[in-house]
Amino acid sequence: YLDNEYFKLPYDLSGSMAKNRFRNEMLWGLGKMFELYKADKDFTMVFDYVCDVEAHFKEKIEFYQLKTNNSATPYTVSKIAKPDKTGKSIIGKLYSIQCADSNPGIVSKLALVVNVPLKTLDKKVHSAEEEISFEDLDDKSLEEIKKYLTTECNVTDVDLKDCYYIYTSMDLFNPQDSMLGRMINFFVSVYGKEPKRATVLFQTLAHTIEIKAAYERKCSSYADLIDKKGFTKIEFEQIIKKAIDISDESIEVIKKEINLIYPEYSLKTKMNISVASIIR
């Protein structure tokens, strides 16, 4: 009965789509933290305040706006620059940050991060380039973008020297698995070995980001912003250190205790499997 009747009801996937977008933003931001940590940068990541993902440094900030396209077709100049029914465009929302910044300001980078390449007006699909400066686009595409931004942002001069298009691969269906693998690779490259509890470590990092991103109130000061919305390098290191401190010796002690407490082979096997699932 329900097989037929339920699917007559109107459905709404906007909530699920919003949650998936939120999840992709968080995981991409975590990947950015791995990148900055390996580069020995002193950073604080801020999630969902001025922009989707923000990398804060001592005096400058990089802003990243994430977009996904399930159809896998390239984004066009019109797609990113032409305003929608509300009068806002994808790149316009990003460029408005620079318009609001003082001169000289704090913006060092504005980047549109997309899981499909950009197709410019010269018919070129930029699939071989991970990061493109908008200033390096063909003249026709550049002029088209500037034309739209001049009107949308109500400015006479458009400066795109700090604006970029980043083409990045994103697993839209199982992003956690992809990022878990990337986290393990990060750990091996930095510390020379895999973390003892990779799944737990990953869940802790992702949960910390989720808490920061989910805070919805206006921050009263920059210090308040960092406290409520920021994930600092120090906090990141503290979480990583806890994973490193789980020694092989402590795991062996647990296994010996299992052997003493559970003499029956089947129970002993179940307990060892449980331990393995926790520390993997």
Q: PLM features: residue spans?
A:
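Acidic metal-coordinating catalytic centers involved in nucleic-acid phosphodiester chemistry
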Residues: 1-16, 69-280
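Catalytic centers of nucleases
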Residues: 14, 18-19, 23-83, 89-90
